[in-house]
A protein has these predicted regions:
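Alpha-helical scaffold domains
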Residues: 1-173
């Protein structure tokens, strides 16, 4: 698997690895271990493959929830950070296991103009998924979203913001 991940991947390669790991926890664990590889291409490609797992196989990553959060908080490479945020967005966030450090990270990235749009959008959605349990936290999220009024937003950021506002409004009905 490492050899395959050491080259530029096409979608057929990704699907082949997904099929290879389908229902095989040992191979998923090996693929996950490759996300730590020193070779940047291998680790990034391994994360990219995980983003293509179907929902059934994606559940295997639920046990890696806190590990993914820990890694996102310190990751320097934007591509890997974006891929890990994508993986976290596909996981449930339970009220009893929220992490304030990750909430703070997400709020900080929402308003950081220096961050890529994809990371800001993912952080917006992840912040909502964590903060929706508490009205006072939702108010903090609304304030962060209001701060975005001061800048010209990309269509993707506008859409993510609108989705959160609409979702929050529907929850109150």
């Amino acid at each position: 698997m490492r050899k395959k991940l050491n080259k530029k991947l096409c979608m057929d390669d990704i699907y082949e690895i997904c099929i290879l790991t389908h229902g095989n926890n040992r191979k998923k664990a090996h693929l996950y271990q490759l996300t730590f590889d020193e070779d940047e291409r291998i680790s990034t490609n391994a994360l990219w493959v995980f983003t293509h797992f179907d929902m059934q196989n994606n559940e295997w990553l639920y046990a890696k929830h806190d590990d993914l959060i820990d890694r996102v908080l310190v990751e320097k490479k934007e591509t890997k950070r974006r891929l890990m945020l994508h993986l976290l967005l596909r996981q449930p966030f339970e009220e009893e296991s929220l992490r304030s450090d990750f909430i703070d990270f997400c709020i900080a990235k929402i308003t950081a103009c220096s961050q890529p749009y994809a990371i800001r959008c993912y952080c917006m959605k992840l912040a909502y998924e964590q903060m929706k349990y508490y009205p006072e936290l939702l108010e903090e999220l609304r304030m962060a979203l209001d701060m975005l009024e001061q800048e010209v937003l990309s269509p993707g950021l506008q859409s993510a913001k609108r989705q959160i506002i609409l979702h929050d409004f529907k929850e109150k009905l």
